[in-house]
Amino acid sequence: MKSQSEFESEMYFIKKKIILTIAFVISLLPMLLNQYGGMKGVQEISGLINLYNPIGIISVLFFIIGVWIPFKNKKINKVFGGLGVVGIVISEIYNFFTWHIMNITGKMSIHNSIEFAFPEFYVGLVISLIMIAVYFCIDKIVKE
């Protein structure tokens, strides 16, 4: 039978995992919006392309592994989860610079990247950056 302190410690970790998972899902919600395109209503591309590329898929898997799969060394969990949240931002930035090359322009251009990104992209990017801060500060946010 577990002691009271072991039970409280276990409940703290479960609470932390649930909060991190909810925050992560919320940080992905802007990807449901149209983030890229030539003109609203004419050519719109969902932010889900950020998750459909290999970086996005691996990042989500790393986050899930880091938060929900217990390792003996807790630093491994922190590294996997951290790679997951940082990887989402990398995926967003990668798509920001490259999505229009095959579809519209045929070349990489910061000007085109800025011109063809809707405000929803920037909102999603800021929320993803906030998620990184939440992930690395969760121990200060959620007290035992």
Short names for language-model regions:
Residues 1-33, 137-144:
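Cytosolic juxtamembrane helix and N-cap/initiation of the first transmembrane helix
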Residues 9-20, 48-52, 73-80, 114-124:
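Membrane-interface helix-boundary signature
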Residues 16-20, 107-142:
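Alpha-helical membrane-associated segments of multi-pass integral membrane proteins
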Residues 16-60, 95:
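Hydrophobic transmembrane helix segments
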Residues 33-43, 69-75, 97-104, 134-144:
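Juxtamembrane transmembrane-helix termini
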Residues 37-52, 93-123:
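Interfacial non-cytosolic loop connecting adjacent transmembrane helices
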Residues 53-67, 125-130:
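Hydrophobic alpha-helical transmembrane segments
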Residues 66-99:
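Loop-to-transmembrane helix junctions at the membrane interface
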